[in-house]
Amino acid sequence: MAERVAAFLKNVWAKEPVLVASFAIAGLAVILPTLSPYTKYSLMINRATPYNYPVPLRDDGNMPDVPSHPQDPQGPSLEWLKRL
């Protein structure tokens, strides 16, 4: 099986090297981002970033789920990002 694949690649490389090179570059473009450390950190940042930002409301004391101030820390901390 490996011999047939090697023979096929050798034959295609001899006939159409531009196509083989473009498919190789496209394959690397699909595979390499998953191995990049930037992908890891961007996923961590996206998980820690809230989708819904607090809206300033007048607190009458009966809203336990609304923060008292819009800048009160909520959710996961991003301290790990500051220490990089």
UniProtKB/Swiss-Prot annotation:
One of its GO terms (cellular component) is mitochondrial inner membrane. It comes from the Eukaryota. The chain crosses the membrane at residues 18-38. Residues 56-84 are annotated as: Disordered. The keyword Transmembrane helix applies. It is found in: Mitochondrion inner membrane. It is a single-pass membrane protein. Keywords: Acetylation, Electron transport, Membrane, Mitochondrion, Mitochondrion inner membrane, Respiratory chain, Transmembrane, Transmembrane helix, Transport. The modification N-acetylalanine is found at residue 2. Belongs to the complex I NDUFA3 subunit family. Complex I is composed of 45 different subunits. Accessory subunit of the mitochondrial membrane respiratory chain NADH dehydrogenase (Complex I), that is believed not to be involved in catalysis. Complex I functions in the transfer of electrons from NADH to the respiratory chain. The immediate electron acceptor for the enzyme is believed to be ubiquinone. This is NADH dehydrogenase [ubiquinone] 1 alpha subcomplex subunit 3. It comes from Bos taurus (Bovine).
